[in-house]
Amino acid sequence: MIYTLTGTHSTGKSTLLGKLKELYPNFHFNDSSTREVTSKEERRLDDISDDSQNRLFKAIEIKELELLQVSKILPTFMDRSFVDFTAYTLAFNKQGKISDTFAAMMQYECEKRLLLNQYDIIFYLPIEFDIVDDGIRSVDKELQRLVDTEIKGLLLNQTNTITLSGNIDERLKQISN
C-alpha cells in the first residue's frame, strides 16, 4: 500500500511525516522524493524550464518504480507525490516558465497515475500555516496559492483523498481514523 501526503510548500508535509515515522515504525517512509533526486541548484525557481522539469520527471519515475516494489513488501508513506510535481509544473506553465506541451504531458502522466490508483490514500494538506523560508522553497504566497489550486483541481474527482487540517496532533488523529 502507498499512502502519500500532497500539498503546496509550507503545509507541514515533512513535519507530519516525521511524526508518522514515530507512530508507524514498521512502514517504509520516503522523505522528500524530489529533494532526493535533485540538487538545490536544480530546484531554484529562477532555473525552471522544460529541461529542468523533464530531468526531475525522469528521476521521479525511477524513484516511483523503486517505491512500487518496496510497497509490495512494506506499507509505504510518501511526503509528496506526482500530484505535487504536476501542480508545480502547471503553475510554472501559467507563469510562462514551462511550455504548454510539457505541462499537458505531465498532466496526462499524473491523471494516468491517479486513474491506475497508484496511491491507495492521498492525504491533502491545505494552506494553514505561514511560509517558512528555508533558503530553497519559494516564499511567494501567490505561487503557494496557485500550486494549491492546481492540486485541488488534480484531486477533484479522486475518491481516495482525505483532507487533513489543524495542528499536527489533529492531523495525526485524522490519519489514524
What is each residue range found by the language model?
Residues 9:
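The conserved Walker
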Residues 1-2:
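Pre-Walker A (Motif I) flank of P-loop NTPase domains
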Residues 16, 20:
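Hydrophobic positions on the alpha1 helix immediately C-terminal to the Walker A/P-loop
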Residues 5:
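Hydrophobic anchor at the beta1->P-loop junction of P-loop NTPases
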Residues 59-100:
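A basic- and aromatic-enriched beta-loop-alpha substructure that forms the phosphate/nucleotide-
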Residues 13:
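Conserved lysine of the Walker
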Residues 88, 92-167:
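A glycine- and Lys/Arg-enriched "phosphate-lid" helix/loop adjacent to the NTP-binding pocket
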Residues 21-63:
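Conserved substrate/cofactor phosphate-moiety recognition/catalytic segment
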